[in-house]
Amino acid sequence: MAPPAPPLSRSFSLYLDVCRFLAAVFVVLSHFPQYGAVAEVANPWLHLGRESVVVFFVLSGFVIAYTTERKNASMREYCIARCTRIYSVALPLVLLGFAGAAFLVVDGFAPPEQFYQLGKVWLYLPMHLLFMGELWTVSEPPPLLAPYWSLGYEVWYYVLFGAMFYLRGRRRLLVVGALLLFVGPKLWLLLPVWASGVAAYHWQKKHTIARPLALAGWCVTLALLVAFKLAGLDVSLRMLVLDNWPFAGLHPKSADRFLADYLVCALVVTNFLCAKNADFSALLRIERPVRWLASYTFTLYLVHALVMRMWLAVYPHRQSDPVDVLSLVVVIVSMTSLIGQVTEHRKEWFEAVFVRLAARWPRRAATQ
């Protein structure tokens, strides 16, 4: 086996953390007008939620390729690492989502039909904990957790990557083929976005870009993203897909923006590759706060939706009142910090559980 590539530079690693945190913030901002916390406005900076998910997908592929090559020598280690990362946040938040929905229904803040999943918890809870909410024609997030939809893509991309990386020969072909058939066309459409992160990681190991060109390229990608939003290309490309989609029985649903996603993906990949060679060493001055903020990204991504939906259901929120809006922001930040302390910041609890479960996994299967 070839020796692993050297670690990423601290400055580039910090840049990726900045992108990760800002992507989560833009998702939160996009939901303020979408959920009705503020009046709908034309400001493009409040409508970057989908583009931020593309950033997450590219980042995910990049980081998984990097950590797998350097740290996870076996499929057993890979599965433990991925399950720990995902379930440390997903499990508590899904349970809180169901509990919050039950509270709203019981106390009369929402009609039972709004949270119909409560009537079949035995079906929907396992479905969401197995990330099956986006398979084929299904498109259902857990109660109060609309952003969870992206995990229905990302987790299966983890599984596909693990099969590709650790299996060999006929077994790999059979397993990958079966997985692709199982997940369905929506996940096929966005797979290139996630896989581009893997490709970007391997490309940057062997290639460099001159710093002046990298700085120019970095600026151009940001300018093109702004132009993309101002021109409304995201909306136009989505309508193009919807108007010309040939499979009436297989609506793309959460993947209906895949053409726009591909364009944004190209900008994100180019931005990352340029940033890697642009030497943003100034970020080292703020390394500590950046790492700290980034450590709450996954929690913020899910918690904000739960908090926002609960707040708007039980509190007479006024869109035009800055005190109400600021209070909602404070509650989101506070709950992210509180819940993050028992999720992302306590991954070792979950890791211990998965290590014990993996101990029952036949050693031969774990090293295939």
Language-model segments: residues:
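Membrane-interface helix-loop-helix regions
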Residues: 65, 86-155, 159, 171, ...
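Hydrophobic core segments of transmembrane alpha-helices in multi-pass, intramembrane catalytic enzymes
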Residues: 51-58, 153-157, 189-197, 263-268, ...
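Residue-level signature of the transmembrane alpha-helical core
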Residues: 21, 58, 91, 95, ...
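Membrane-interface alpha helices of multi-pass inner-membrane proteins
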Residues: 176-185, 292, 296
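Alpha-helical transmembrane segments
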Residues: 18-28, 92, 124, 128, ...
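Alpha-helical transmembrane segments in multi-pass integral membrane proteins
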Residues: 1-15, 25, 29-47, 65-77, ...
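Transmembrane alpha-helical segments and their boundary/interface "anchor" motifs
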Residues: 50-53, 57, 68-106, 115-127, ...
